[in-house]
Amino acid sequence: MSVDFSSLAQQFTEFYYNQFDSDRTQLGNLYREQSMLTFETTQLQGAKDIVEKLVSLPFQKVAHRITTLDAQPASPNGDVLVMITGDLLIDEEQNPQRFSQVFHLMPEGSSYYVYNDIFRLNYSA
């Protein structure tokens, strides 16, 4: 299975953050029951629990600005690892928060789903 992992990562990242920024409730289609999210130190498993966590975040408006995106194949089966860094603009805040996020995408038929998702805010030392 030959995958253009760079294009896949770019397309996935654009879709994911556009969806997150406009309507987080719709992100459930990207996860499965075996999917896991580590959000800061909280670990959740399953699409339902993951979306509940994302929807419960304490802000109304959010915008992700990507500064770096790296991807590489993760297995001979077509899995792809995606690492993103960027800025998070929350509500009307003028100072963005830095973040890092890693996705492990697994093939499913002709598409992919998020098997692992690790999110971390990056605070200055």
Swiss-Prot record:
Keywords: Cytoplasm, Protein transport, Transport. Pfam families: NTF2. One of its GO terms (cellular component) is cytoplasm. It is found in: Cytoplasm. Residues 8-121 form the NTF2 domain. GO terms for biological process: nucleocytoplasmic transport; protein transport. SUPFAM superfamilies: NTF2-like. Gene3D superfamilies: 3.10.450.50. The keyword Lyase does not apply. CDD domains: NTF2. InterPro entries: NTF2, NTF2-like_dom_sf, NTF2_dom, Nuclear_transport_factor_2_euk. Facilitates protein transport into the nucleus. Could be part of a multicomponent system of cytosolic factors that assemble at the pore complex during nuclear import. This is Nuclear transport factor 2. It comes from Kluyveromyces lactis (strain ATCC 8585 / CBS 2359 / DSM 70799 / NBRC 1267 / NRRL Y-1140 / WM37) (Yeast).
